[in-house]
Amino acid sequence: MPISFDDTDETLRHIRLTGRLDMTGIDAISETFTELSVATHRQVIVDLSGVNFLVSFGIRELITNAKLIQQRGGRMIIFVGDNKAVLKTLETTGIDTLIPTFVNAAQAGRAALG
């Protein structure tokens, strides 16, 4: 499962996940995802617009890292773009009420900075 990131500045990091967030996908990126999430950046936008499959293992990974970010005073924001399948999964499980979730990139960016 591909993972990439870029830093807007010293406080905001964008992490992009692509592919399947299932057991195999999580095994492939878990350590890197955690390292990128809990770096010195306080705000992290996780881009799931390129994820084509999301199951409980992926949801657990998101929650675990969101908690780690929160423990150091930061916040995770999820961006799904027009990925209706992932958005529906996040809404059905209630994750969108725990981790702010956006379909609009500009709104996600404002939420991360605000």
Task: Report each predicted region and the residues it spans.
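A short, charged, amphipathic alpha-helix used as a generic interaction element across diverse proteins
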Residues: 108-114
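Short beta-strand/loop segment at the start of cytosolic alpha/beta domains
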Residues: 1-16
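Residues at or immediately preceding the N-termini of alpha-helices
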Residues: 26, 105-106
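Amphipathic alpha-helical interaction surfaces in cytosolic regulatory modules
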Residues: 23-98
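Short acidic-hydrophobic, aromatic-tinged amphipathic segments that line or gate anion-handling sites
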Residues: 99-104
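Residues that form or immediately flank small-molecule/cofactor binding pockets and catalytic motifs
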Residues: 10, 83, 106
